[in-house]
Every structure is written in C-alpha cells, then in structure tokens.
UniProtKB/Swiss-Prot annotation:
Its cofactor is Fe(2+). Belongs to the cyclic nucleotide phosphodiesterase class-III family. Fe cation 1 binds at D19, H21, D59, H198. AMP binds at H21, D59, N89, H90, H198. GO terms for molecular function: 3',5'-cyclic-AMP phosphodiesterase activity; metal ion binding; nucleotide binding. Fe cation 2 binds at D59, N89, H157, H196. It holds the Pfam family Metallophos. This is Probable cyclic nucleotide phosphodiesterase syc0937_d.
Amino acid sequence: MVEDFAGDAMTLSIAQITDLHLLVDPQAALRGCVTTPRAAAVFGNLKQRSPDLLLLSGDLSEDGSPASYERLRDWVEELGCPAIAIAGNHDQPERLTEICGRSPFMGEPVYSIQGWRIIALDSYQPKRIDGRLRGDQLDWLDQRLGEDSSPTLLMLHHPPVLIGVTKMDAIGLKDGPEFLEVIAHHQQVRLVLSGHAHQAFIQGRGLTTFLGCPATAMQFDQPELPAGWRSLELEPDGSWRSQIHWVDTDSIHFA
C-alpha cells in the first residue's frame, strides 16, 4: 500500500534525526552522554524550522522503555508534522509500533510525497547489533521500485555501504552487497539515508547518494561535538540539497 501525503509547496522540506538512545530516566547518561536533553534540544530547533516531514532512522530508545517512546511521541506531536520512524538495533519494534504507530506517525512503508517516493526499510535483527534486510524484503523492494519511476528516497538504520570506520563497518548491513545490486537496476533511487554510525558521511554510486546522519546522542569518533541532525530539500525533478545542523546543548536543562 502507498500512502499519499501532500505538502503546501513544491519543495519538500525533510528533517532526519537518528540515534536518540532515549532512556526511561531523562537524567540518565549513556557513555557519559545524557541523551534526553540533547534530543529535546534538537526538537526545539526543529520547531523553529517547521519541516514538512520528519524521518527518524532508528535507535530511538536505548532501553526500549514505554516512557522513552511516549516522550518521543509527545515531541513529534508538538512538532506538528508527519513522521516516519524505523527501528534500530537498540529499539523494541513492537513497543515502538504500539506507542508511536499512530498519527502523526505514518504507518505504511511506501509514501508518495510531492513527486517523490519514500520507502522505509527494516534492517532490525533481534539480539543483533548488525543489520540485515533479508531476501524477502529485498524482493519486495525490487518490486516496489519496478512499479514507479518517480525519484525515490530509501531509509534504513544500518549503513548499506562501508564508511571506512572498521568497528562500524563490522556491524553495518550484512546483506549490503545484495541491497546495492537491487538498487543498481533502478536509477530513480536518488538518496539512501541511514543512521547507526553516529556520524555524517556521503558517498556516491552512479545516480544514488548515500548519506549518514549524526546522532542526537553522542558522536562516536568526535564525542566533543553537540547533537546533530540533517535537513534535506527535495525538488520534484529529483534534485536535492542537504545540510548538517549542530545544536548546542550546553545550556539545556531537562526536567
């Protein structure tokens, strides 16, 4: 099923956030990083920018607690735009769906939005850090891409390409080569967004660009950096622009 969403302008403004790692205790720290205030600061920044659509690319909760997903749901409702969320390896997918699987969250895996298609993929594996799409989902993706030639954005949690960081490449998308083979036959795939790496990266393969996004939680290789997110502007002709934003959280106090 394809869900249609009509925005107000020709340019589609998207915000991508990832790897929030929210905890049941909003004051608790993960690897020395108090994750909840950082995520709250990013949502405050997003409210000032009013994106048309929010993409959340996994690891939304660290502990899978109902309180963490309820907090996330409340922030998205306050933001006031539709949102597409996928699970990362730290998430509890069933709980994510139960708590966040209703408006403003959009529940279908394929969306038609202002001349673009957005397809959300599931790379989650129970009790695994690495990811896998599996053959049935790859076959499904191949079929979906074959039915519409509109410019397409794909989102998954695990990077499907090697990013040059040994520890991260070892826990990326295990069937990345098979995924790349599928999309190589569909030149309308313009963007592939991922999380998991806790850093921004960009790679190009043919007409497809692969983009990584910094975390709202800690950045693995540069822990001194603040919370980050990615903005994208998509045009109906398939062109796009993107920018990384950093949000200073030093003065943020979350209660």
